[in-house]
Regions:
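N-terminal helix-turn-helix DNA-binding module of bacterial transcription factors
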Residues: 1-65
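Amphipathic helical "hinge" segments at domain boundaries
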Residues: 48-114
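Short beta-strand elements in bilobed, periplasmic/extracellular small-molecule ligand-binding domains
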Residues: 94-105, 209-233
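Periplasmic-binding protein-like
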Residues: 123-129, 188-193, 224, 244-255, ...
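Flexible loop/hinge segments that line or gate small-molecule binding clefts
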Residues: 129-175, 255, 281-293
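Hydrophobic alpha-helical segments within soluble ligand-binding/sensing domains
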Residues: 164-191, 209-210, 230-241, 257, ...
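An alpha-beta-alpha
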Residues: 175-215, 320-337
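Flexible loop/turn connectors
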Residues: 235-337
Length: 337
């Protein structure tokens, strides 16, 4: 059989029913691929006298089939459930698609581990596990032309910088959950949150405000307190609100929620009898609290898998979704009456 001079990796992949990545690995001899598949590709190449052009060969040989996960150093200290779930899900998804994963710790003053990894070209791309308003990591990766994906949406000033931005519908979810909580009573309810430098907190706040606007609820019924980073800050905010007669609290994350419940009980208030709480984040700690806390549930594992999967598809020039947007579930439990 005479082969056309224009035979490409795409053609070979299509004829054999495998991905372009698999063909590239068979050509380069790099990456995870079964011996049987490698032999099948090589046999096809020999039969059709395929000679990869310089560009195709260079592309195949330059791939490392490694990804780097960038984890903020303070996340390790805080032992955040989202991080554990996301990391294990990324590793599993990457392994399924033939990639290995390297972990790089980062903080605002020292990006040495990742810089060294990039300098030695040990990875094909980077996955960032958080998005913030002013992100030195996004700026560095963009400047160096390194492809990256994010767990979470980027701020508008970085629009288009990431290859993939995977996120949950925080605005829609928080709006729906806030409506469910707000319509249950005419009593005021306070929103308590952490650092607004995190894009997820900005989106959750937007969802709450959208719910208040759509329900035409006056501002004095929904006081907002942000920047609650520790127990003492939470105590100050909650006790101030208690003095104003507020007995219902909607918390942006599980840490703020647990601290709020601690402060309420320290003040002699029972939940849900004397005060009520709800959370924009659902974790084991929230579900197993006494009483179980009403919460907005997001699938962190699926978010991480989607980000990794679409990113790898993009790196291999396959079709991909640049902005996967995942849904949510409203969980009403005993902490709200």
């Amino acid at each position: 059989m005479t082969i056309k001079p224009s035979l490409t990796i795409d053609d070979i992949a299509r004829e054999l029913g495998v991905s372009k990545t698999t063909v590239s690995r068979a050509i380069s001899g790099k990456g995870r691929i079964s011996a049987a598949t490698r032999e099948r590709v090589q046999a096809y190449i020999e039969e059709h006298n395929y000679k990869p052009n310089a560009s195709a060969k260079s592309l195949a040989e330059s791939k490392t089939y490694n990804l780097a996960i960038v984890l903020p150093r303070d996340f390790i200290k805080l032992d955040i459930p989202f991080v554990r779930t996301a990391m294990s899900s990324i590793v599993d998804e990457a392994h399924t698609l033939g990639y290995n994963v390297m972990l790089c710790l980062d903080d605002d003053t020292d990006s040495t581990p990742l810089m060294r990894t990039l300098d030695y070209r040990k990875v094909d791309g980077v996955i960032l596990t958080r998005t913030v308003e002013d992100d030195h990591m996004v700026e560095m990766l963009t400047k160096r032309g390194i492809p990256f994906a994010t767990l979470g949406s980027l701020p508008l000033k970085y629009a288009g910088a990431a290859v993939v931005e995977a996120d949950h519908d925080h605005i829609g979810g928080c709006c729906a959950f806030a409506k469910a909580v707000l319509t249950g009573s005419d009593a005021p309810i306070a929103l308590l949150g952490n650092d607004l430098n995190y894009i997820v907190n900005q989106n959750r706040l937007s969802g709450f405000r959208k719910a208040c606007q759509e329900l035409v609820i006056p501002l004095n019924r929904t006081p907002i307190r942000m920047g609650i980073n520790d127990l003492e800050g939470c105590r100050e905010a909650v006790e101030e609100l208690l003095a104003q007669g507020v007995r219902r609290f909607l918390c942006m994350d599980e840490d703020v929620c647990v601290r709020t419940m601690t402060v309420l009980r320290d003040n002699g208030l029972s939940i849900p009898g004397d005060a009520q709480v709800a959370s924009f984040a659902d974790t084991d700690q929230i579900r197993n609290a006494q009483p179980p806390v009403s919460a907005l549930s997001f699938d962190s594992a699926e978010l991480a898998r989607a980000a990794c999967r679409e990113f790898i598809h993009a790196l291999n020039d396959d079709s991909y979704d640049p902005k996967p947007l995942l849904g949510y579930k409203v969980r009403l439990r005993q902490s709200m009456i």
